[in-house]
A protein has these predicted regions:
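A short, surface-exposed alpha-helical micro-motif characterized by mixed small hydrophobic
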Residues: 132-134
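Catalytic Walker B motif of ABC-type/P-loop ATPase nucleotide-binding domains
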Residues: 91-95
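ABC ATPase "signature
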Residues: 150-151
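Helical segment within the ABC ATPase nucleotide-binding domain
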Residues: 105-118
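Conserved ABC ATPase "signature" region
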Residues: 33, 37, 44-62
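Conserved catalytic motifs of ABC-family nucleotide-binding domains
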Residues: 87
């Protein structure tokens, strides 16, 4: 056995914010405190960050309600708050704006931009190409377990919208519903 100094990382390498059932029998505030404790944050830091996140995400009035009583959008926001409370180097998000109202969506976009401006990296999985275009610098187009393109957004898009480029890359359905003539009203 050797002696020496053990250094503990203060910032987690990455945190994922998956679409999953959280500890929904805790209140939003309790859940944030729990997540902060998991990352060994001190109590003052936990309280400061939790209150700041609750306020920024418009969850203060619901902070003491059980998460199981939250709407889908509120649950998405508390999940994001739990992931970001430890200030990870990399944040992995699945459909970060799904189920949130437009105002909350704008707030989440601002929080993510601020996170990136502060040196963090955000990895987003989304089927909403407009969201990806508005938030991402680099993209990877993956379909059917195959990587079709990766690189800077402009390089992958090649002057087209990401939606059109995605369909082009993955060989989208050429039919596009033309056979549904009964949908036409006379």
């Amino acid at each position: 056995m050797t002696s020496g100094l053990i250094r503990r990382r203060r910032r987690p390498r990455w945190v994922s914010c998956p679409t999953m059932k959280t500890f929904d029998r805790l209140s939003g505030r309790e859940l944030l405190r729990f997540c902060g404790m998991l990352h060994r944050l001190d109590e003052a830091t936990i309280n400061e960050r939790a209150e700041g996140l609750l306020d920024a995400l418009s969850l203060t009035s619901a902070a003491d309600l059980l998460v199981c009583d939250y709407s889908a959008g509120m649950t998405k926001k508390i999940d994001l708050a739990c992931a970001i409370i430890a200030d990870p180097a990399v944040l992995v998000l699945d459909e970060p704006l799904e189920s949130v109202d437009p105002l909350s969506g704008q707030t989440i976009r601002s929080i993510l931009r601020r996170f990136v401006d502060g040196g963090g990296t955000v990895v987003i999985s989304s089927h909403v190409m407009e969201l990806v275009e508005s938030l991402c610098d680099s993209v990877a187009v993956i379909a059917g377990g195959r990587l079709h393109a990766i690189g800077a957004l402009d390089d992958v898009c090649q002057g087209k919208s990401l939606q059109n480029r995605f369909v082009e890359l993955v060989g989208g359905n050429a039919n596009m519903g033309e056979g549904l003539t009964w949908l036409r009203r006379s």
